[in-house]
Protein backbone atom coordinates (compact mmCIF):
# COMPACT_ATOMS: atom_id res chain seq x y z
CA UNK A 1 0.00 0.00 0.00
CA UNK A 2 1.57 3.29 -1.06
CA UNK A 3 0.70 6.83 -2.02
CA UNK A 4 -0.57 7.22 -5.57
CA UNK A 5 -0.23 10.60 -7.28
CA UNK A 6 -3.77 11.65 -8.20
CA UNK A 7 -4.40 11.63 -11.91
CA UNK A 8 -6.76 13.91 -13.79
CA UNK A 9 -9.05 12.01 -16.10
CA UNK A 10 -10.66 12.60 -19.43
CA UNK A 11 -11.64 16.08 -20.51
CA UNK A 12 -10.67 17.59 -17.18
CA UNK A 13 -6.99 17.29 -17.99
CA UNK A 14 -7.34 20.61 -19.77
CA UNK A 15 -7.91 23.95 -18.06
CA UNK A 16 -11.58 24.81 -17.81
CA UNK A 17 -13.54 28.00 -17.38
CA UNK A 18 -15.73 28.33 -14.26
CA UNK A 19 -18.80 28.17 -16.49
CA UNK A 20 -17.65 24.97 -18.21
CA UNK A 21 -20.36 22.32 -18.26
CA UNK A 22 -17.99 19.41 -17.66
CA UNK A 23 -18.50 17.37 -14.50
CA UNK A 24 -15.87 17.80 -11.82
CA UNK A 25 -16.30 14.25 -10.58
CA UNK A 26 -15.49 11.32 -12.79
CA UNK A 27 -18.26 8.88 -13.50
CA UNK A 28 -16.58 5.57 -12.87
CA UNK A 29 -17.10 5.65 -9.12
CA UNK A 30 -20.09 7.95 -8.76
CA UNK A 31 -21.93 7.25 -11.98
CA UNK A 32 -25.45 7.95 -10.78
CA UNK A 33 -27.05 11.29 -11.51
CA UNK A 34 -29.42 13.19 -9.26
CA UNK A 35 -31.75 16.14 -9.66
CA UNK A 36 -31.05 19.51 -8.07
CA UNK A 37 -33.65 18.79 -5.38
CA UNK A 38 -31.92 15.51 -4.47
CA UNK A 39 -28.60 17.35 -4.32
CA UNK A 40 -30.18 19.96 -2.03
CA UNK A 41 -31.40 17.23 0.33
CA UNK A 42 -27.93 15.63 0.36
CA UNK A 43 -26.30 18.96 1.28
CA UNK A 44 -28.95 19.83 3.90
CA UNK A 45 -28.67 16.35 5.38
CA UNK A 46 -24.91 16.73 5.63
CA UNK A 47 -25.23 20.15 7.31
CA UNK A 48 -27.89 19.19 9.86
CA UNK A 49 -26.31 15.93 10.89
CA UNK A 50 -24.94 15.51 14.39
CA UNK A 51 -23.74 19.13 14.56
CA UNK A 52 -27.19 20.67 14.91
CA UNK A 53 -27.67 19.06 18.32
CA UNK A 54 -24.76 21.15 19.67
CA UNK A 55 -25.92 24.54 18.37
CA UNK A 56 -27.83 25.52 21.55
CA UNK A 57 -24.61 24.68 23.42
CA UNK A 58 -22.73 27.09 21.12
CA UNK A 59 -25.20 29.83 22.16
CA UNK A 60 -24.25 29.14 25.78
CA UNK A 61 -20.55 29.42 24.90
CA UNK A 62 -20.73 32.59 22.80
CA UNK A 63 -23.55 34.44 24.54
CA UNK A 64 -26.94 34.27 22.84
CA UNK A 65 -26.96 37.57 20.87
CA UNK A 66 -23.40 37.12 19.61
CA UNK A 67 -24.07 33.43 19.01
CA UNK A 68 -26.92 34.16 16.60
CA UNK A 69 -24.79 36.70 14.73
CA UNK A 70 -21.94 34.18 14.49
CA UNK A 71 -24.34 31.51 13.24
CA UNK A 72 -25.45 33.70 10.34
CA UNK A 73 -21.82 34.63 9.64
CA UNK A 74 -20.65 31.00 9.56
CA UNK A 75 -23.55 30.08 7.26
CA UNK A 76 -22.59 32.89 4.87
CA UNK A 77 -18.93 31.83 4.86
CA UNK A 78 -20.03 28.24 4.23
CA UNK A 79 -22.15 29.28 1.24
CA UNK A 80 -19.36 31.43 -0.18
CA UNK A 81 -16.59 28.86 0.27
CA UNK A 82 -18.62 25.98 -1.21
CA UNK A 83 -19.05 27.95 -4.43
CA UNK A 84 -15.41 29.03 -4.25
CA UNK A 85 -14.26 25.41 -4.15
CA UNK A 86 -16.13 24.45 -7.31
CA UNK A 87 -14.80 27.59 -9.03
CA UNK A 88 -11.31 26.52 -8.00
CA UNK A 89 -11.94 23.06 -9.42
CA UNK A 90 -13.02 24.58 -12.72
CA UNK A 91 -10.01 26.92 -12.84
CA UNK A 92 -7.57 24.07 -12.20
CA UNK A 93 -9.36 21.39 -14.21
CA UNK A 94 -9.61 19.10 -11.19
CA UNK A 95 -12.40 16.82 -10.06
CA UNK A 96 -12.03 16.56 -6.27
CA UNK A 97 -11.01 18.62 -3.26
CA UNK A 98 -7.82 16.57 -3.01
CA UNK A 99 -6.76 16.98 -6.63
CA UNK A 100 -7.56 20.72 -6.44
CA UNK A 101 -5.19 21.21 -3.51
CA UNK A 102 -2.60 18.90 -5.07
CA UNK A 103 -2.50 20.98 -8.25
CA UNK A 104 -2.44 24.24 -6.30
CA UNK A 105 0.07 23.47 -3.53
CA UNK A 106 1.68 20.20 -4.58
CA UNK A 107 2.16 17.05 -2.54
CA UNK A 108 2.54 18.73 0.91
CA UNK A 109 -0.79 20.51 0.45
CA UNK A 110 -2.39 17.35 -0.87
CA UNK A 111 -1.20 15.37 2.15
CA UNK A 112 -2.43 18.01 4.62
CA UNK A 113 -5.82 18.24 2.94
CA UNK A 114 -6.17 14.46 2.75
CA UNK A 115 -5.47 14.22 6.48
CA UNK A 116 -8.06 16.88 7.33
CA UNK A 117 -10.58 15.50 4.86
CA UNK A 118 -10.21 12.07 6.41
CA UNK A 119 -10.25 13.27 10.02
CA UNK A 120 -13.38 15.42 9.80
CA UNK A 121 -15.88 12.84 8.46
CA UNK A 122 -14.26 10.07 10.50
CA UNK A 123 -14.67 12.03 13.75
CA UNK A 124 -18.19 12.93 12.59
CA UNK A 125 -18.92 9.20 12.26
CA UNK A 126 -17.75 8.77 15.85
CA UNK A 127 -20.06 11.58 17.00
CA UNK A 128 -22.97 9.98 15.12
CA UNK A 129 -22.38 6.72 16.98
CA UNK A 130 -22.25 8.55 20.32
CA UNK A 131 -25.56 10.25 19.56
CA UNK A 132 -27.16 7.01 18.38
CA UNK A 133 -26.16 5.23 21.58
CA UNK A 134 -27.21 8.10 23.85
CA UNK A 135 -30.58 8.79 22.23
CA UNK A 136 -31.82 5.30 21.39
CA UNK A 137 -30.80 3.84 24.77
CA UNK A 138 -33.15 6.33 26.46
CA UNK A 139 -35.86 5.51 23.93
CA UNK A 140 -35.75 1.78 24.67
CA UNK A 141 -35.72 2.44 28.43
CA UNK A 142 -39.23 3.87 28.04
CA UNK A 143 -40.67 0.72 26.48
CA UNK A 144 -43.12 -1.14 28.79
CA UNK A 145 -41.62 -4.14 30.53
CA UNK A 146 -38.03 -3.23 29.69
CA UNK A 147 -35.51 -3.26 32.53
CA UNK A 148 -33.71 0.13 32.41
CA UNK A 149 -30.54 -1.60 33.61
CA UNK A 150 -30.55 -4.28 30.92
CA UNK A 151 -27.35 -4.62 28.91
CA UNK A 152 -29.41 -5.05 25.74
CA UNK A 153 -30.51 -1.41 25.87
CA UNK A 154 -27.13 -0.03 26.90
CA UNK A 155 -25.51 2.57 24.65
CA UNK A 156 -22.65 0.20 23.77
CA UNK A 157 -24.96 -2.59 22.62
CA UNK A 158 -27.11 -0.16 20.62
CA UNK A 159 -24.07 1.33 18.88
CA UNK A 160 -22.88 -2.11 17.81
CA UNK A 161 -26.31 -3.31 16.66
CA UNK A 162 -27.12 -0.10 14.73
CA UNK A 163 -23.72 -0.31 13.04
CA UNK A 164 -24.14 -3.92 11.93
CA UNK A 165 -27.77 -3.63 10.84
CA UNK A 166 -28.01 -0.07 9.48
CA UNK A 167 -24.97 2.15 9.03
CA UNK A 168 -22.60 -0.46 7.61
CA UNK A 169 -25.03 -1.74 4.92
CA UNK A 170 -25.92 1.84 3.89
CA UNK A 171 -22.24 2.78 3.77
CA UNK A 172 -21.55 0.00 1.26
CA UNK A 173 -23.25 1.97 -1.53
CA UNK A 174 -20.84 3.19 -4.20
CA UNK A 175 -23.13 5.87 -5.62
CA UNK A 176 -23.93 8.90 -3.46
CA UNK A 177 -26.87 9.81 -5.74
CA UNK A 178 -28.71 6.77 -4.35
CA UNK A 179 -28.74 8.44 -0.93
CA UNK A 180 -30.96 11.29 -2.15
CA UNK A 181 -34.21 9.65 -0.98
CA UNK A 182 -32.59 8.64 2.32
CA UNK A 183 -31.48 12.24 2.81
CA UNK A 184 -35.05 13.41 2.11
CA UNK A 185 -36.37 11.11 4.86
CA UNK A 186 -33.67 12.38 7.21
CA UNK A 187 -34.62 16.00 6.49
CA UNK A 188 -38.30 15.28 7.22
CA UNK A 189 -37.37 13.65 10.53
CA UNK A 190 -35.28 16.70 11.40
CA UNK A 191 -38.37 18.87 10.91
CA UNK A 192 -40.22 16.60 13.36
CA UNK A 193 -37.38 16.95 15.89
CA UNK A 194 -37.49 20.70 15.49
CA UNK A 195 -41.21 20.58 16.26
CA UNK A 196 -40.50 18.67 19.48
CA UNK A 197 -37.85 21.19 20.58
CA UNK A 198 -40.14 24.15 19.82
CA UNK A 199 -43.04 22.52 21.69
CA UNK A 200 -40.92 21.92 24.77
CA UNK A 201 -39.63 25.50 24.66
CA UNK A 202 -43.22 26.61 25.15
CA UNK A 203 -44.28 23.98 27.69
CA UNK A 204 -41.07 23.24 29.61
CA UNK A 205 -39.05 26.44 29.27
CA UNK A 206 -41.10 28.56 31.73
CA UNK A 207 -40.63 25.89 34.44
CA UNK A 208 -36.83 25.90 34.27
CA UNK A 209 -35.08 28.77 36.09
CA UNK A 210 -32.81 30.93 33.99
CA UNK A 211 -29.16 31.10 34.93
CA UNK A 212 -27.33 34.30 35.81
CA UNK A 213 -26.32 36.40 32.80
CA UNK A 214 -28.28 34.12 30.48
CA UNK A 215 -28.76 36.96 27.98
CA UNK A 216 -25.31 38.56 28.14
CA UNK A 217 -24.21 39.68 24.67
CA UNK A 218 -20.87 37.85 24.51
CA UNK A 219 -18.91 35.25 26.47
CA UNK A 220 -15.20 34.30 26.47
CA UNK A 221 -15.77 30.96 24.72
CA UNK A 222 -17.05 32.51 21.49
CA UNK A 223 -14.19 31.02 19.45
CA UNK A 224 -15.06 27.53 20.67
CA UNK A 225 -18.64 28.29 19.67
CA UNK A 226 -17.45 29.03 16.13
CA UNK A 227 -15.84 25.59 16.16
CA UNK A 228 -19.16 23.94 17.04
CA UNK A 229 -20.97 25.98 14.38
CA UNK A 230 -18.32 25.11 11.80
CA UNK A 231 -18.76 21.45 12.66
CA UNK A 232 -22.49 21.82 12.07
CA UNK A 233 -22.25 23.63 8.73
CA UNK A 234 -19.29 22.00 7.04
CA UNK A 235 -20.03 19.83 4.02
CA UNK A 236 -16.99 20.83 1.96
CA UNK A 237 -15.48 17.37 2.23
CA UNK A 238 -18.30 15.94 0.09
CA UNK A 239 -19.16 18.92 -2.12
CA UNK A 240 -17.37 17.54 -5.20
CA UNK A 241 -19.23 14.24 -4.75
CA UNK A 242 -22.60 15.99 -4.65
CA UNK A 243 -21.62 18.33 -7.49
CA UNK A 244 -20.61 15.39 -9.65
CA UNK A 245 -23.93 13.67 -9.01
CA UNK A 246 -25.82 16.52 -10.71
CA UNK A 247 -27.09 16.11 -14.25
CA UNK A 248 -24.94 18.37 -16.45
CA UNK A 249 -23.25 20.10 -13.50
CA UNK A 250 -22.31 23.74 -13.89
CA UNK A 251 -21.08 26.38 -11.46
CA UNK A 252 -24.35 28.30 -11.92
CA UNK A 253 -26.42 25.20 -11.11
CA UNK A 254 -24.19 24.42 -8.13
CA UNK A 255 -24.61 27.98 -6.85
CA UNK A 256 -28.41 27.56 -6.89
CA UNK A 257 -28.14 24.24 -5.05
CA UNK A 258 -25.88 25.73 -2.38
CA UNK A 259 -27.92 28.92 -1.89
CA UNK A 260 -31.09 26.85 -1.43
CA UNK A 261 -29.40 24.30 0.84
CA UNK A 262 -27.79 26.88 3.13
CA UNK A 263 -30.99 28.93 3.31
CA UNK A 264 -32.96 25.88 4.46
CA UNK A 265 -30.17 24.81 6.80
CA UNK A 266 -29.70 28.20 8.47
CA UNK A 267 -33.45 28.52 9.10
CA UNK A 268 -33.52 25.12 10.82
CA UNK A 269 -30.27 25.78 12.71
CA UNK A 270 -31.23 29.23 14.03
CA UNK A 271 -34.65 28.02 15.16
CA UNK A 272 -33.16 24.93 16.79
CA UNK A 273 -30.39 26.89 18.53
CA UNK A 274 -32.79 29.59 19.74
CA UNK A 275 -35.43 27.23 21.12
CA UNK A 276 -32.89 24.92 22.71
CA UNK A 277 -31.05 27.74 24.46
CA UNK A 278 -34.24 29.56 25.50
CA UNK A 279 -35.39 26.39 27.25
CA UNK A 280 -32.25 25.59 29.26
CA UNK A 281 -29.98 28.72 29.08
CA UNK A 282 -26.83 28.03 31.14
CA UNK A 283 -27.75 24.38 31.74
CA UNK A 284 -27.52 23.54 28.03
CA UNK A 285 -25.42 20.45 27.28
CA UNK A 286 -23.36 19.57 24.20
CA UNK A 287 -26.05 17.02 23.33
CA UNK A 288 -29.32 18.92 23.81
CA UNK A 289 -31.31 15.74 24.40
CA UNK A 290 -29.25 15.16 27.56
CA UNK A 291 -31.13 18.16 29.02
CA UNK A 292 -34.58 16.62 28.73
CA UNK A 293 -36.13 14.37 31.34
CA UNK A 294 -36.22 10.65 30.63
CA UNK A 295 -39.91 10.46 31.54
CA UNK A 296 -40.89 12.89 28.77
CA UNK A 297 -42.60 10.75 26.12
CA UNK A 298 -42.74 13.49 23.48
CA UNK A 299 -38.98 14.00 23.81
CA UNK A 300 -38.55 10.22 23.71
CA UNK A 301 -40.21 10.29 20.29
CA UNK A 302 -37.89 13.15 19.30
CA UNK A 303 -34.89 11.13 20.46
CA UNK A 304 -36.03 8.22 18.31
CA UNK A 305 -36.38 10.47 15.25
CA UNK A 306 -32.98 12.02 15.86
CA UNK A 307 -31.34 8.63 16.28
CA UNK A 308 -32.76 7.55 12.91
CA UNK A 309 -31.69 10.85 11.33
CA UNK A 310 -28.11 10.38 12.47
CA UNK A 311 -28.06 6.79 11.24
CA UNK A 312 -29.22 7.98 7.81
CA UNK A 313 -26.59 10.75 7.74
CA UNK A 314 -23.70 8.46 8.68
CA UNK A 315 -23.18 6.93 5.18
CA UNK A 316 -22.47 10.33 3.58
CA UNK A 317 -19.50 10.83 5.91
CA UNK A 318 -18.31 7.27 5.30
CA UNK A 319 -18.39 7.95 1.54
CA UNK A 320 -15.87 10.76 1.95
CA UNK A 321 -13.61 8.90 4.36
CA UNK A 322 -13.44 5.95 1.98
CA UNK A 323 -12.84 8.21 -1.03
CA UNK A 324 -9.86 9.89 0.63
CA UNK A 325 -8.20 6.56 1.40
CA UNK A 326 -9.01 5.29 -2.09
CA UNK A 327 -7.43 8.32 -3.77
CA UNK A 328 -4.32 8.38 -1.58
CA UNK A 329 -3.47 4.69 -1.46
CA UNK A 330 -5.27 3.02 -4.38
CA UNK A 331 -5.15 5.57 -7.18
CA UNK A 332 -8.89 6.30 -7.10
CA UNK A 333 -10.26 2.82 -7.88
CA UNK A 334 -11.26 -0.17 -5.75
CA UNK A 335 -12.37 -3.66 -6.63
CA UNK A 336 -15.64 -4.86 -5.10
CA UNK A 337 -13.81 -6.94 -2.49
CA UNK A 338 -11.52 -4.06 -1.47
CA UNK A 339 -14.51 -1.70 -1.43
CA UNK A 340 -16.34 -3.88 1.09
CA UNK A 341 -13.20 -4.56 3.13
CA UNK A 342 -12.19 -0.90 3.37
CA UNK A 343 -15.72 0.23 4.25
CA UNK A 344 -15.96 -2.40 6.99
CA UNK A 345 -12.57 -1.37 8.38
CA UNK A 346 -13.51 2.33 8.52
CA UNK A 347 -16.88 1.66 10.15
CA UNK A 348 -15.35 -0.77 12.65
CA UNK A 349 -12.66 1.72 13.70
CA UNK A 350 -15.22 4.50 14.20
CA UNK A 351 -17.42 2.15 16.21
CA UNK A 352 -14.64 1.01 18.53
CA UNK A 353 -13.57 4.58 19.31
CA UNK A 354 -17.16 5.72 19.92
CA UNK A 355 -17.58 2.97 22.51
CA UNK A 356 -14.84 4.64 24.58
CA UNK A 357 -16.15 8.24 24.48
CA UNK A 358 -19.19 9.55 26.37
CA UNK A 359 -19.12 13.34 26.04
CA UNK A 360 -20.26 14.83 22.73
CA UNK A 361 -19.36 18.48 23.41
CA UNK A 362 -15.57 18.07 23.28
CA UNK A 363 -15.87 16.00 20.09
CA UNK A 364 -17.84 18.78 18.39
CA UNK A 365 -15.41 21.48 19.56
CA UNK A 366 -12.19 19.74 18.55
CA UNK A 367 -13.49 18.53 15.21
CA UNK A 368 -14.79 22.02 14.53
CA UNK A 369 -11.60 23.95 15.28
CA UNK A 370 -9.04 21.42 14.05
CA UNK A 371 -10.75 20.11 10.91
CA UNK A 372 -13.82 22.15 9.98
CA UNK A 373 -12.17 25.58 10.33
CA UNK A 374 -9.33 24.86 7.87
CA UNK A 375 -11.67 23.06 5.45
CA UNK A 376 -14.17 25.96 5.46
CA UNK A 377 -12.02 29.08 5.95
CA UNK A 378 -8.38 28.47 5.12
CA UNK A 379 -7.97 25.99 2.27
CA UNK A 380 -10.74 27.18 -0.12
CA UNK A 381 -9.58 30.80 0.17
CA UNK A 382 -5.90 29.86 -0.24
CA UNK A 383 -6.61 27.81 -3.38
CA UNK A 384 -8.74 30.52 -4.95
CA UNK A 385 -6.25 33.28 -4.19
CA UNK A 386 -3.48 31.33 -5.90
CA UNK A 387 -5.51 30.18 -8.92
CA UNK A 388 -7.67 33.19 -9.71
CA UNK A 389 -6.45 35.88 -12.09
CA UNK A 390 -9.12 38.35 -10.98
CA UNK A 391 -7.95 41.81 -9.81
CA UNK A 392 -7.01 42.11 -6.14
CA UNK A 393 -10.00 44.36 -5.57
CA UNK A 394 -12.46 41.74 -6.87
CA UNK A 395 -15.09 40.92 -4.23
CA UNK A 396 -14.27 37.19 -4.21
CA UNK A 397 -10.58 37.89 -3.62
CA UNK A 398 -11.28 40.41 -0.87
CA UNK A 399 -13.55 37.92 0.89
CA UNK A 400 -10.95 35.17 0.53
CA UNK A 401 -8.33 37.50 2.06
CA UNK A 402 -10.57 37.93 5.11
CA UNK A 403 -11.44 34.24 5.43
CA UNK A 404 -7.84 33.02 5.56
CA UNK A 405 -6.58 34.83 8.71
CA UNK A 406 -9.93 34.44 10.48
CA UNK A 407 -9.78 30.69 9.93
CA UNK A 408 -6.24 30.55 11.28
CA UNK A 409 -7.26 32.40 14.46
CA UNK A 410 -10.29 30.15 14.99
CA UNK A 411 -8.19 27.03 14.51
CA UNK A 412 -5.32 27.93 16.85
CA UNK A 413 -7.20 29.84 19.55
CA UNK A 414 -10.13 27.41 19.50
CA UNK A 415 -7.87 24.42 20.04
CA UNK A 416 -6.00 26.09 22.92
CA UNK A 417 -9.26 27.11 24.61
CA UNK A 418 -10.87 23.69 24.15
CA UNK A 419 -7.90 22.04 25.88
CA UNK A 420 -7.31 24.61 28.63
CA UNK A 421 -10.96 25.40 29.35
CA UNK A 422 -12.97 22.19 28.85
CA UNK A 423 -16.71 22.35 29.42
CA UNK A 424 -18.59 20.17 31.89
CA UNK A 425 -20.42 17.11 30.60
CA UNK A 426 -23.33 15.51 32.49
CA UNK A 427 -23.72 12.45 30.27
CA UNK A 428 -26.30 10.01 31.60
CA UNK A 429 -27.35 12.17 34.58
CA UNK A 430 -30.91 13.29 35.17
CA UNK A 431 -31.06 17.08 35.40
CA UNK A 432 -32.17 18.65 38.71
CA UNK A 433 -35.40 20.11 37.27
CA UNK A 434 -36.62 16.62 36.37
CA UNK A 435 -37.28 15.95 40.06
CA UNK A 436 -40.60 17.30 41.44
CA UNK A 437 -39.00 18.79 44.56
CA UNK A 438 -36.75 21.04 42.47
CA UNK A 439 -39.09 22.24 39.72
CA UNK A 440 -40.38 25.10 41.89
CA UNK A 441 -36.97 26.82 42.03
CA UNK A 442 -37.26 30.37 40.74
CA UNK A 443 -33.94 32.02 41.46
CA UNK A 444 -30.65 30.37 40.58
CA UNK A 445 -27.38 31.87 41.79
CA UNK A 446 -25.33 28.65 41.63
CA UNK A 447 -23.44 27.27 38.67
CA UNK A 448 -25.02 24.69 36.36
CA UNK A 449 -22.37 22.21 37.48
CA UNK A 450 -23.48 22.48 41.12
CA UNK A 451 -27.08 21.91 40.23
CA UNK A 452 -26.51 18.87 38.03
CA UNK A 453 -24.37 16.97 40.48
From Swiss-Prot:
Any matching Pfam family: Aa_trans
Entry-linked InterPro entries: AA_transpt_TM (IPR013057)
Lipid bilayer topology: Multi-pass membrane protein
Residues that span the membrane, as ranges: 39-59, 66-86, 106-126, 152-172, 179-199, 222-242, 262-282, 299-319, 337-357, 359-379, 399-419
Positions with biased composition (Basic and acidic residues): 12-32
UniProt tissue specificity: Widely expressed.
GO terms of molecular function: active monoatomic ion transmembrane transporter activity; inorganic cation transmembrane transporter activity; L-amino acid transmembrane transporter activity; monoatomic cation transmembrane transporter activity; neutral L-amino acid transmembrane transporter activity; secondary active transmembrane transporter activity
GO-annotated biological processes: amino acid transmembrane transport; inorganic cation transmembrane transport; sodium ion transport
GO cellular component entries: membrane
Superkingdom, taxonomy of origin: Eukaryota
Chief localisation class: membrane
Disulphide linkage map: none
Family to which this protein belongs: Belongs to the amino acid/polyamine transporter 2 family.
Function description: Putative sodium-dependent amino acid/proton antiporter.
Protein name (database record): Putative sodium-coupled neutral amino acid transporter 11
Naturally occurring in which organism (per UniProt): Rattus norvegicus (Rat)
Organism ancestry: Eukaryota, Metazoa, Chordata, Craniata, Vertebrata
Gene: Slc38a11
Amino acid sequence: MSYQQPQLRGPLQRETDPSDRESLVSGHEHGGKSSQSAAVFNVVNSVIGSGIIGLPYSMKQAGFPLGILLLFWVSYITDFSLVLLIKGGALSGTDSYQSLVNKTFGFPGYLLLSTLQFMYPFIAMISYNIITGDTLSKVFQRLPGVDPGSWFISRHFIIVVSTVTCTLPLSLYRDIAKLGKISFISTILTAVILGVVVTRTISLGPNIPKTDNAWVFARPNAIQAIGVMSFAFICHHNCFLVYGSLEEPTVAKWRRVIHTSILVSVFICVLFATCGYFTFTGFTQGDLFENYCRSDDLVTFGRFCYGITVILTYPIECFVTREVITNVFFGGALSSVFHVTLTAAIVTAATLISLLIDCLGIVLELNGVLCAAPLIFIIPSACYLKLSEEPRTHSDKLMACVMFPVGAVVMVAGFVMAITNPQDCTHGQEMFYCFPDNISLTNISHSPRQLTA
